[in-house]
């Protein structure tokens, strides 16, 4: 049987209400990993309306905000365990990521960001010119000859 009033739960609920405000948002759990030529970040946001999601980028800092509205105060609650209010998370991205091509999607309570590696950060070959009309392309310890026609 559920207790109508549990002082510890009331204190916990109060703490979530106070900490989950726009001035001091609650943190959202996330996972991040590299997948081929991009980084993927997933945030758990169950029960969040997609219209309340806000993603901003300034230089190399991505800020993700979401809000779960407060419950009707006239409702007699028997349990309140889900956090309400504002959620926020900031990620500082490395210079090797292309912040202009970030893609976001929201499905089944999970917000996914796909952040591609910048072209300038991808491995590439550098041609070394020689005076005899040939170019040598450095490839690790090996060398490949390129002949100009």
Curated annotation (Swiss-Prot):
InterPro entries, per database record: A-crystallin/Hsp20_dom, HSP20-like_chaperone, Small_HSP
PROSITE patterns associated with the record: SHSP
Chain ranges of the sHSP domain: 21-131
Free-text function comment from the UniProt entry: Not known. This protein is one of the major immune reactive proteins in mycobacteria.
Family statement: Belongs to the small heat shock protein (HSP20) family.
Alphabetical list of PANTHER family matching this protein: HEAT-SHOCK PROTEIN 20 FAMILY MEMBER (PTHR11527)
Identification of the protein by name: 18 kDa antigen 1
């Amino acid at each position: 049987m559920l207790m109508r009033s549990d002082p510890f739960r009331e204190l916990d609920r109060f703490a979530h209400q106070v900490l989950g405000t726009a001035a001091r948002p609650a943190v959202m759990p996330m996972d991040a990993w590299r997948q081929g030529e991009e980084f993927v970040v997933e945030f758990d946001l169950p029960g969040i309306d997609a219209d309340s999601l806000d993603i901003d980028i300034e230089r190399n800092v991505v800020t993700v905000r979401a809000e779960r509205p407060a419950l009707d105060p006239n409702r007699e609650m028997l349990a309140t365990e889900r956090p309400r209010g504002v959620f926020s998370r900031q990620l500082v991205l490395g210079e090797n990521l292309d912040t202009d091509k970030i893609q976001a999607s929201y499905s089944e309570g999970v917000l996914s960001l796909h952040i591609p590696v910048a072209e300038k950060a991808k491995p590439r070959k550098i041609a070394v010119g020689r005076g005899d009309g040939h170019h040598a392309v450095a490839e690790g310890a090996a060398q490949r000859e390129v002949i100009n026609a």
